[in-house]
Amino acid sequence: VNTLRRAAHVTLTVAAIAVATACSAGGTTTPAASVTGAAGTATQAPATQAPGAKAAALAPRAASKTARKAGKPKLGIADITPMGEKVERVGVGFPIIVTFDRAVRDRAAAEAALQVQAEKPVEGAWRWVSDRKVVYRTKTYWKPHQKVLFTARLSQIPGNEAAKDVSRRFAVGTANISVVDTKKHVMKVRRDGKLAKTIPISAGRGGLPRNGVDVYLTTTGVHLAMGKKRVETMTSSWLGVTDPKDPLYYKLEIPWAVRISDSGEYVHQSAGDYQFLGKSNQSHGCVRATPAGAKWFYGISQRGDVIEVTGTKRKLDWRNGWSYWQLSWNQWKRGSALPAGSASASPTPSASPSAGEDALQG
């Protein structure tokens, strides 16, 4: 079984992505509830649940004599995206995110223990974004309508024989790829390559600089859907504005909200001002859509769907949420701890994980 290449350390500069847009939900950068349903449904995790929050920590394997001699595992997993409650249906840009339970000293050994197998294999690589977290991204988008198996063979890491291997399965669904043209004020949504809908929109109007960044501009770049909520509370508290008498104050309940960054950007239903949709940019940074368009978009959205925004002067930082497609493939591979930095995924085996692996309901 071929293993995929994995990731070298890249320091995550929190300050670089801390500047939010005025659409920020509740003034935080907590990802919205995860999209776990099939395309066309609206199945959600609880609103307070961040992607990957339910991943279980690993426990020692009790059945093995080698494990008993080795003692407790030196390295386990604290969190995995996708979550393990069910087989999640995701978009073609979906990343696999692994957070270990402690800082990883030998990143190359840990990375070599991570395997990705797909029914329709594509080249991919891991990139370290902190001393505990590593992210897998493919060179090109996943091929739609297939199953993927991720396995962390932690027991194969030297000195970590007591650890239990972990696997997760997910399904890549319809290829939902949207392009938001902020100059023409329209979002075109393609599903499996065919134009499915053209939605009039209104993007960020600009005009509010903070620390050299116009936070009222929508960020240009390749975003991914990170989650969605039927109704999202959006406030001005991220600006430090909490007084209702302040002209910059707002607190709005926004329907059909699909989150596309960690700086508070969403595609959502416009809260009034419908006369601007398709004509001018008037939002605080989010992509406002018609009620019918926003509801439809919410319904088809899967975590990992691609939403590319064009036409603004504010560039999307690759460290902002799941904006990993902002890096070129060569840039991405340089984050691997392994020399080659990439390999083709192996075909997914038809058999279920072996008895020594913990499938974590996934």
Model-flagged regions — what are they?
Residues 84-87, 136-139, 212, 244, ...:
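Second-shell loop/turn segments in exported
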Residues 215-232:
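Short, solvent-exposed cationic patches
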Residues 174-175, 217-220, 235-362:
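Exported/periplasmic cell-wall-interacting domains
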Residues 198-200, 222:
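Residue-level detector of high-confidence beta-strand sites
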Residues 2-19, 24-175:
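Acidic, low-complexity Ser/Thr/Gly/Pro-rich repeat segments typical of extracellular/periplasmic
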Residues 97-99, 179, 188, 224-226, ...:
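Soluble periplasmic/extracytoplasmic beta-strand elements of cell-envelope proteins
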Residues 50, 66-70, 168-191, 209-210, ...:
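Low-complexity, Pro/Ser/Thr- and charge-rich linker/hinge segments at domain boundaries
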Residues 101-105, 119, 131, 139-141, ...:
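Solvent-exposed coil/turn segments that connect beta secondary-structure elements
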